[in-house]
Amino acid sequence: MKRLLFFALLLSFCNTLFAQEIKTDSILTEKQNAEWISEFEKLDYKSEKIAEIKKKIFADTIYKRQKNYCRIVIKNQETIQEAMEIANCECKIVFVLGFKKIAYSLDPNEYPKTHTVLELVTDENIDKITVLKGDIASALYGTNGRCGVVVMYSESRKFKRKIKNVL
């Protein structure tokens, strides 16, 4: 009987070792995005930046862009600035593919053909990559841009035609 009990405990313990990790972080915060942007800005090569952008876009597909606003609770003896730093506001970085007169948002949750568009993006097609933060991002992209905006610019007409054909 002791052997059976010992075997059952050993079996249940082994099962917990191989169980998948439960993801408890269900929101993407401003702090996480600020850390990603600071790491992104340290990259030197355009090909590395494009690969990192693609990885981030696919990783963020599990998060949906929320339409509600951030709720900030101010406690006793706390300034508004301190409360805003503590608040966990949910937001996503906006990724944009920009041409001279038109720009496309790269969010797979809103636009299902984003995966196809991203397959066409290479370092030869992209002329420059710009990161917008703070007031500039909010002014251009509204509340969606408060966590930052990454814009990939291209002046290639051939690439623009390929994108139009996909969309």
List each model region and its residues:
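Short, small/polar-rich motifs associated with maturation and membrane association
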Residues: 20-167
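Bacterial Sec-dependent N-terminal signal peptides
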Residues: 1-25
